[in-house]
Design a protein with these regions (language model features):
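N-terminal low-complexity or simple alpha-helical regulatory segments
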Residues: 2-108
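Short terminal or interdomain "cap/linker" segment that borders an active site or interface and mediates
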Residues: 2-4, 9-15, 19, 23, ...
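Amphipathic interaction/junction segments at domain boundaries or subunit interfaces
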Residues: 58-165, 187
Length: 193
């Protein structure tokens, strides 16, 4: 029996524990890095943000693959920069809430999601398939429609701030579509929910 509960946005977020579980060859697209630079830019230049995150400076191209561990370091640092007075989990959630708009702003996002308009059910159904195009060789996301108003999104082998950032991504989709909803989570461990 799965018990779903409210996400704990005020709980400590252990970056190192997450990073220990990320496969060394796990990759994601450069668009996720550049999205973080845009969010942090009013407060911090990209070069300084990379330094803060201990990520080597280089050019990030939207459709090239980069180390997922570097993205997670940058995401964690960006959360502290963009929402300095919030608990880190809440800050990660807020960044997650922006990612769907960020994806829609890309060419790939327009191709994948543009035709769906504001159809929440279609977006939640297509989202996991898009995940495989935007990350490589790690993790699995599966969306399961339970009824007209309920979806279960399963994350497997994906230690990527599931209770904070990824809850925020679903909240961001709901907000974009003008749907009032509640996101609850069943956390099995850092990589599975």
């Amino acid at each position: 029996v799965r018990v779903f509960s409210e996400p704990r946005f005020d709980a400590k977020v252990d970056l190192d524990a997450h990073l220990r579980l990320v496969p060394k060859d796990a990759r994601c697209k450069g668009m996720f890095f550049t999205h973080l630079f845009k969010l942090a830019e009013p407060r911090m230049a990209p070069e300084r943000l990379l330094e803060l995150a201990s990520v080597s400076e280089r050019r990030f191209l939207p459709f090239h693959d980069y180390a997922m561990a570097d993205h997670m370091r940058l995401l964690h640092a960006t959360a502290g920069v963009t929402h300095p007075s919030s608990p880190r989990g809440e800050a990660l959630r807020r960044i997650g809430q922006t990612i769907y708009d960020g994806i829609l702003g890309s060419h790939a996002g327009k191709v994948l999601f543009g035709v769906l308009g504001l159809d929440t059910a279609q977006i939640l159904a297509i989202g996991p398939k898009a995940f495989k195009l935007m990350t490589t060789n790690w993790g699995e996301v599966v969306s399961e429609r339970i009824d007209d108003r309920t979806f279960h999104v399963h994350y497997r082998s994906m230690p990527a701030f599931l209770e904070t950032y990824h809850v925020g991504t679903v909240e961001g989709v709901l907000a974009k579509c003008g749907v009032r909803g509640r996101v609850r989570i069943h956390v099995r461990d850092l990589a599975n929910a």
